[in-house]
């Protein structure tokens, strides 16, 4: 049964500007520790791909927060949900702390899809009550 849906789109240049103004500190506010490892690896290969990764994760967290009906308010925080890839490449949300408990208490399963193209990053999330979704592996795929 569908519990909620959420979507978000972000202009990549907008995030580039925020990153410049904050001297990169913005990324520390948004990404969880496992996402940060992936971001740094991608950024080392290509500044553009690192920025696109950050933008898709930002959009995913916004879409996820809308799908579960909380928006960006407690227990939903930027770092409480990480979007990690399954070995198949499928993105899977991984919640921690009080957010994980909140989602579990409601029996929610959330699926997230992300995409980016030159100027924009977009994410869509659908939350369902019931059903099972495999948890992402502890060491996410590094694609």
Swiss-Prot record:
GO cellular component, one term: cytoplasm
Keywords for this protein: Cytoplasm, Fatty acid biosynthesis, Fatty acid metabolism, Lipid biosynthesis, Lipid metabolism, Magnesium, Metal-binding, Transferase
Signal peptide start-end: none
Chief location bin: cytoplasm
Molecular function, one GO term: magnesium ion binding
Class of the enzyme per the UniProt entry, highest EC level: transferase
Cofactor(s) required, per the database record: Mg(2+)
InterPro entries: 4-PPantetheinyl_Trfase_dom, 4-PPantetheinyl_Trfase_dom_sf, ACPS, Ppantetheine-prot_Trfase_dom
Presence of the UniProt keyword Transferase in the record: yes
Record has Lipid metabolism as a keyword: yes
Coiled-coil ranges from the UniProt annotation: none
Catalytic reactions on record: apo-[ACP] + CoA = holo-[ACP] + adenosine 3',5'-bisphosphate + H(+)
Residues that bind Mg(2+): 8, 62
Compartment annotation: Cytoplasm
Gene Ontology process terms (BP): fatty acid biosynthetic process
Enzyme Commission identifier(s): 2.7.8.7
Stored NCBIfam families: acpS, pantethn_trn
Summary of the function given for this chain in its UniProt record: Transfers the 4'-phosphopantetheine moiety from coenzyme A to a Ser of acyl-carrier-protein.
Stated family: Belongs to the P-Pant transferase superfamily. AcpS family.
UniProt protein name: Holo-[acyl-carrier-protein] synthase
Origin species: Cupriavidus metallidurans (strain ATCC 43123 / DSM 2839 / NBRC 102507 / CH34)
Lineage, uppermost ranks: Bacteria, Pseudomonadati, Pseudomonadota, Betaproteobacteria, Burkholderiales
Name of the encoding gene: acpS
